[in-house]
Amino acid sequence: MARAKKVDKIKELMWKPKFIRNIGIVAHIDHGKTTLSDNLLAGAGMISEELAGQQLYLDFDEQEQERGITINAANVSMVHEYEGQDYLINLIDTPGHVDFGGDVTRAMRAVDGVIVVVDAVEGVMPQTETVLRQALKENVKPVLFVNKVDRLIKELELTPQQMQERLIKVITEVNKLIKAMRPDKYSEWKIDVANGSAAFGSALYNWAVSVPSQKKTGIGFKEVYEHIKEGKVKELAKKSPLYQVVLDMVIRHLPSPIEAQKERIAVIWKGDINSEVGKAMVNCDPKGPVALMITKIVVEPQAGEIAVGRLYSGTIRPGMELYIVDRKAKNRIQTVGLYMGPRRVEVDEIPAGNIVAVIGLKDAVAGSTCTTVENLTPFESIKHYSEPVVTMAIEAKNPRDLPKLIEVLRKLAKEDPTLHITLNEETGEHLISGMGELHLEVKVEKIRRDYKLDVITSPPIVVFRETVTGTSPVVEGKSPNKHNRFYIVVEPLPEKVIQMFKEGVVDMKMDKKERRRLLQEAGLTSEEAAGAEEYYEGNLFCDVTKGIQYLNETMELILEGFREAMRAGPIAREPCMGIKVKLVDCKLHEDAVHRGPAQVIPAVRSAIFAAILQAKPALLEPYQKIFITVPQDMMGAVTREIQGRRGQILEMKTEGDMVTIIAKAPVKEMFGFAGAIRGATSGKAIWSTEHAGFELVPQNLFQEFVMEVRKRKGLKLEMPKPEDFVGL
């Protein structure tokens, strides 16, 4: 099919949502996601077959090709014929590296089904679990592709019987995860060899088999085994091609937008399902109001900013005006397009159910809701499962480039919401914070290469969190004019409360009674639960006062004081986390003039600071879980390397002559680990990390770490005292 014909076919199919599949591919790093995507494209005639596998069509960012890992989720559309009917498959490739978890979460919002790729030799790995968990949470249905099956025969020399046992083990592990995460969906979503929701093969050598494909082609395990033993892989790829087997599985088992939106809208949108727009989204109605969720901003050198997202209802055309709900802005669409490989094809209009690329939505960011309905409830904000934990300072080598650097940093933050940018106007120093060392390296490289900017960066540093481990006495904060007084108590916030907010079980928009009940269950007293006013970055503010005059009209200023205190705590001006701040009493001046922002905010902030310093203050540091697979004789070298970094070994699993070590260590000690482990194992270690939350810094290191941070920030090199903030 020539290119023009393909475009016509895609244009025709985009109007038939019954024949559309919006899917993602997720996996652990290096399990073969991008190679699989390429071969699916080759099969659908989008790239030449000889090149697939080497070409890494989706890794079209130069850096991705050099590093050999997928950094951004790329979009492609292709046409596949199944049982005499053409289908339009929109495919999003997602990164498997933990440092890029944000992209995966966003891609899950745009798709209805995923192909989970698992390496037959390594089995289900930690990152497989993480990405599958994200998919299940967003109500996205999985199918399974077990990759690199040829290695079982060539490298591990397994018999056909052992091979099947190995593959059944992988399926059982994936099913265990589905059952644990979605017991309600398990019966219809479980992976089953017999019905063809699992396929096996080699993405690199372009072949695959499944039970339904065996019925069509006569190629089953026995034939696969013989072909590989005899080195006839090319023949195998001709008789049972990968794309045919996998795309058939996608069409048979993954839902169309029509089926999926009936179930998914309620999970990702909290508005009224019976409203006009609610019904239009549930029915994927092209005639309804426009409801578009942006999942990614792509910056193309010629076209500029392109907003890519999923259209849930309505039809979009150039010239239309859309509200960007979260930005309270209105933008006019310039062009609308679909993807074919990395190429954007502009069309006249696109209806609901498709993945779209729009130019002109200049205020949109990843996660925005764009619509023709004023005051539409936005889609639930996309939850990222890891928060930025590593920071580096960055400056332009040539001071003349400073304005350009600021503009580039803003652009990067818009493309990738997991990247946090802090511009310090006083020192002229800019900080970028990300999910790990690699995440930041990639961004800095992008600045140098794509924007031709010479920049200098500091070595990476870890972001600590300040917290408390005890309860403070009541602390009085006075406003500068002495007319207002605030009485504050600070204590630890129960872990269960933090978890509930993080998972979205509780939020400040929900019904008050329901929230009160849930917070009490999680360990708050009934006064605290009823008085919960604001949850901010892992901290809770509770108003437990009774009948205080003027408090309502002053509350927003009090909360601003709370937020300021939580953004940068008293110990080392690091963000706070896990703190419950209670307002137990206050005295306010009757005249609003005497209780303005300049009076209330500093009074509340300094009272909170003094209270924190009297509540057994502590630092939390981010930890990483480390998974390393090495030959057994190198186990000693690896455990020494981990233990030398304040790490602890959690468990060890042996399989054949390889051993997998699972450990955890503070991120602070993990810089340079990649090089060290490569050296210690002469490059034979396969390793990956994932975030393991925050833990208390050991008491014997507390002082040293605080001074380190204070020195770096140019603060006084002494431990702060409560009297620095309030007159005791």
Curated annotation (Swiss-Prot):
One of its GO terms (molecular function) is GTP binding. GTP binds at residues 27-34, 93-97, 147-150. PANTHER family: ELONGATION FACTOR-LIKE GTPASE 1 (PTHR42908:SF3), TRANSLATION ELONGATION FACTOR-RELATED (PTHR42908). The modification Diphthamide is found at H594. Keywords: Cytoplasm, Elongation factor, GTP-binding, Nucleotide-binding, Protein biosynthesis. This is Elongation factor 2. It is found in: Cytoplasm. It comes from Archaeoglobus fulgidus (strain ATCC 49558 / DSM 4304 / JCM 9628 / NBRC 100126 / VC-16). Catalyzes the GTP-dependent ribosomal translocation step during translation elongation. During this step, the ribosome changes from the pre-translocational (PRE) to the post-translocational (POST) state as the newly formed A-site-bound peptidyl-tRNA and P-site-bound deacylated tRNA move to the P and E sites, respectively. Catalyzes the coordinated movement of the two tRNA molecules, the mRNA and conformational changes in the ribosome. Pfam families: EFG_C, EFG_III, EFG_IV, GTP_EFTU, GTP_EFTU_D2. Its main location: cytoplasm.
